[in-house]
Amino acid sequence: MNRRIIALLIAFIMLFGLMTGCASGKQETAAPETAQTESPAAEEAAAEPEQTEEVPAEEEAPAEPETVSFTDSLGRTVELPADITRIAPSGAVATMILAAIAPECMVTINAAPSESRMAFLPANLAALPETGQMYGSKANLNLETLLAADPQVVIDLGDKKGDMTEGLDALQEQIGIPVIFIEADLPHMAEAFRTLGGLLSGKADRGEFLAALVDRTTTMAEENAAKITDDMRVRVMYTTGEDGLGTNAAGSMQAQVLDMVGVENAVVVEDVSNKGGGNIISLEQLYNFDPDVILFSDGSIYDTVADDSAWSQLTAISTGKYYEVPSSPYNWLSGPPSMNMILGVWWLGNLIYPEIYDYDMETMTQELYKTLWGYELSSEEVTALLGNSTLKAAAQ
């Protein structure tokens, strides 16, 4: 009996040991699962590291604003997109300035550049839809084309005119797109480039670069003009039109370059016109003005004027001191008065007062084309541009 009991106890102990060993084996192979199915307290403890990685709401960086308030040169406060990459110019002046700072952002153009102009300008301008002009005698803004291009803002640049505030407000309400004005005549051009650099996405450096060029130009002109005494002052007439009887009189925006470099504008009239064609004068008035130098715009009678009896008696013609204003890609003095005037300041100062504006205009022309339009002028192209002015004067 005792032996049977002892045998049963031994069997029981062996069986218990086997059961314990299986249980241990199962725990080892199932360890990953049991770690995930632990008690609620253990689950919360395991989840705590994920919670601590989350940034509390109050510490998150504020979202970038979608719009910004901008006060334009007319004092109008307009809400603009914070990230501007699609712009439409209001006309020719705006086209020229915007093409210098951000051609890739332009979605329209006032008018397609001619083939000769496109040779110097960014290639994308040729394919842009034409929207016409917002202001002037040729105002013909095409709203349908403008809206189809989907700009974020319409930008008007140039000089202040009449009741612009009312006109821009009305247009903005009509099209549902922000419309702003930035003053950009010669005295305000550097500021205009800096303003555009701040508004347009990624253009701060380019805006400052162009503004620095304007500052350099105006400072140079102011310093040199101050050296010109009254007895040195040259009387200059700047003509327009095929017959040369359109004139940009003293005080006209179209004649800003003449004022800046220190010449005397020979044409003085009571009712000054700021239009591209200027004031129309008669031959009698022309004889009375009798300037020392005459500047002809392209497409005029420049080539034949020396053989024209109506003109040959004038001092400027008889002495050979008449010149043609370079006009590629745009007239360097005006037409329209925009950033092309920067070229005009360097050119006219050197043409009239080479001993004061003392630099190589051929080299300067290449530098300015590179800066403004990214175009590398060849020496042959420089000769073509300056042949009827700087190079002609140097040969006299």
Language-model features: locations:
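Hydrophobic core
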Residues: 10, 14-18
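Bacterial lipoprotein signal-peptidase II cleavage site
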Residues: 18-31
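Alpha-helical, coiled-coil/dimerization segments enriched in small aliphatic residues
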Residues: 135, 247-277
